[in-house]
Amino acid sequence: MAKLTSAVPVLTARDVAGAVEFWTDRLGFSRDFVEDDFAGVVRDDVTLFISAVQDQVVPDNTLAWVWVRGLDELYAEWSEVVSTNFRDASGPAMTEIGEQPWGREFALRDPAGNCVHFVAEEQD
């Protein structure tokens, strides 16, 4: 029987190189591949693709969810390099950790405007 084994969110950005730099230099991802208008970054078992777009409406409406072991540790790590003032910050920012119907999470907005939610796995 066939078994699905993973999925890769595709984030969008008007500046792919700048987005890759943010995810790698500030958030600890590694470059998997980088083309002119498409890239992949990896951290642990998570891969994110970044695709070029011309219209800012696309990244402003892109959402993804990533499940995490060690949510509190990840939040502490990233809060040293990303603003935690999500509502007032105009660039990259994170929300505080909060409880949602699907679990504890925080959201991160990257420089392109993508919003990625990081959710604690149940054993956290």
Swiss-Prot record:
The VOC domain, residue ranges: 3-121
SUPFAM superfamilies named among the record's database cross-references: Glyoxalase/Bleomycin resistance protein/Dihydroxybiphenyl dioxygenase
Swiss-Prot/TrEMBL GO biological process terms: response to antibiotic
UniProtKB keywords: Antibiotic resistance
Superkingdom of this protein's organism: Bacteria
InterPro entries: Bleomycin-R, Glyas_Bleomycin-R_OHBP_Dase, VOC
Keyword Magnesium attributed: no
One Pfam family per UniProt: Glyoxalase_7
NCBIfam families linked: ble_BLMA_gen (NF033156), ble_Sh (NF000489)
Known function: Binding protein with a strong affinity to the bleomycin family of antibiotics.
Subunit relationships: Homodimer.
Record family assignment: Belongs to the bleomycin resistance protein family.
Record protein name field: Bleomycin resistance protein
